[in-house]
């Protein structure tokens, strides 16, 4: 579904092109509809947006709806993750318009990196992505905690 890292630019109106492989899948499976939201679990310095095909988002929403409403952390997560979400559709030029709120959260500048995450993709500011990637790659035993999960 969504694999690879793709560099794109954000235009002056806040629109970004979706990579050909991503848009082909989106058009074939969900008529170009997707939901973009904030990465509510990101740590400071690692803020990005997450884009879900609409059918995948609907499954995520159902799981979120099952969270206990009396749990303060669950309510806070839902407020951020669902409350900041925006339903979008690819335009005729295969672009999506990212709102000022979403762009502000992820501190998106002109250059972007789209990172495939199998059933969704992330939208990063290019400078932030490059810095984070360098940090992650330079970590000594950074992935050792995954044990047998790493293939």
Curated annotation (Swiss-Prot):
* Gene Ontology terms, MF aspect: DNA-binding transcription factor activity; transcription cis-regulatory region binding
* Entry's Gene Ontology cellular component terms: cytoplasm; nucleoid
Tell me, what is an example of a GO biological process annotation in this record? Answer: negative regulation of DNA-templated transcription initiation
**Keyword Calcium carried by entry:** no
For this UniProt record, give its keywords in alphabetical order, as a comma-separated list. Answer: Cytoplasm, DNA-binding, Repeat, Transcription, Transcription regulation
InterPro entries from the UniProt entry: MraZ, MraZ_C, MraZ_dom, MraZ_N, MraZ_sf, SpoVT-AbrB_dom, SpoVT-AbrB_sf
Domain SpoVT-AbrB: residue ranges:
5-56, 85-128
- List cystine links: none
Listed SUPFAM superfamilies: AbrB/MazE/MraZ-like
* Location of the protein in the cell: Cytoplasm, Nucleoid
Q: What is its main location?
A: cytoplasm
Annotated signal sequence range: none
Q: Name one Pfam family in it.
A: MraZ
Q: Which family does it belong to?
A: Belongs to the MraZ family.
HAMAP family hit by this protein: MraZ
- Tell me, how does this one assemble? Forms oligomers.
Q: Which PANTHER family match?
A: TRANSCRIPTIONAL REGULATOR MRAZ
The molecule here is called Transcriptional regulator MraZ
**What's the encoding gene here?**
mraZ
């Amino acid at each position: 579904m969504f694999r690879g890292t793709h560099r794109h630019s954000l235009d002056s109106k806040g629109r970004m092109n979706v990579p050909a492989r991503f848009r082909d899948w989106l058009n074939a499976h969900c008529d170009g509809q997707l939901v973009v939201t904030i990465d509510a679990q990101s740590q400071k310095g690692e803020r990005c947006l997450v884009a879900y095909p609409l059918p995948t988002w609907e499954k995520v929403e159902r799981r979120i709806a099952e969270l206990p409403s009396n749990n303060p952390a669950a309510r806070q997560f839902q407020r951020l993750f669902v409350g900041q979400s925006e339903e979008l559709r690819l335009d005729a030029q295969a672009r999506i318009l990212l709102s000022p709120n979403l762009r502000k959260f992820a501190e998106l500048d002109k250059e972007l990196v789209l990172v495939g995450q199998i059933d969704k993709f992330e939208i990063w500011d290019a400078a932030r992505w490059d810095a984070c990637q360098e940090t992650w790659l330079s970590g000594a035993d950074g992935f050792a905690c995954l044990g047998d999960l790493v293939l």
